[in-house]
């Protein structure tokens, strides 16, 4: 689940539900997993705050365990040494994008973690706004931006997962993939090929289909 699969990029809560489902298919039933699945399928946002509210409301032991695991994940992420850097071409591409467009970060991670990471690597100056898990789904985040007056034909979602493509499609905006394993080339293509097409109105459905096919080809499942 996740890194090199078709489910890459989904939230940790959605990942947990998928794991429970696959365990159940193998005859292993995790007690309380139905409480977690019910919350994930009905919550307006899959965030730490939303989970806390549901734990208090329901008193579910399974959700309380999910909360403990979620908090432990957050602590470990905060404690990670900054050993990884942005892929080659990211900073330059974001700089180029920001000279001609507003840039928003749309993520399933929590906003404080995103802001900290972008600041650490000197990328924060290239983003105008951050939409984290607190805002809701990625599709909701894009919809919020469109509600501010942006034209869908002038908006592009950049991401490395099918969930990003689906969020873009749900709002009628273009999508450019960052192909896992080919990140540097993908960022260069965004800057040199995809962005000019968007700016000149030549980002065709055929071009979009080609990009989506390329992303599907590098993911399994």
What is the meaning of each model-derived region?
Residues 1-109, 206:
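Alpha-helical substrate-recognition element adjacent to the catalytic core
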Residues 82-102, 109-221:
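C-terminal cap/substrate-recognition subdomain and adjoining C-terminal extension
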């Amino acid at each position: 689940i996740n890194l090199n699969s078709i489910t890459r990029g989904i939230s940790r809560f959605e990942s947990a539900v998928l794991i429970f489902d696959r365990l159940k298919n193998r005859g292993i039933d995790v007690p309380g997993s139905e409480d977690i699945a019910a919350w994930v399928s009905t919550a307006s946002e899959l965030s730490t705050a939303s989970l806390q509210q549901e734990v208090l409301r329901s008193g579910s032991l399974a959700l309380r365990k999910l909360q403990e695991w979620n908090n432990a994940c957050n602590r470990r992420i905060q404690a990670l040494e900054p050993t990884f850097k942005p892929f080659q071409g990211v900073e330059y591409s974001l700089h180029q994008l920001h000279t001609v467009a507003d840039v928003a970060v749309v993520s399933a991670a929590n906003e404080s973690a995103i802001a900290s990471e972008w600041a650490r690597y000197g990328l924060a100056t290239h983003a105008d706004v951050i939409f984290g898990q607190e805002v809701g789904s990625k599709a909701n985040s894009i919809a919020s931006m469109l509600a501010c007056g942006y034209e869908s034909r002038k908006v592009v979602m950049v991401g490395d997962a099918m969930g990003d493509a689906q969020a873009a499609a749900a709002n009628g905006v273009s999508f450019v993939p960052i192909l896992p394993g080919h990140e540097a080339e993908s960022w260069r293509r965004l800057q040199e090929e995809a962005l000019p097409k968007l700016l000149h109105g030549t980002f065709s459905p055929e071009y979009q289909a080609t990009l989506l096919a390329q992303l599907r080809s590098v993911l399994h499942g």
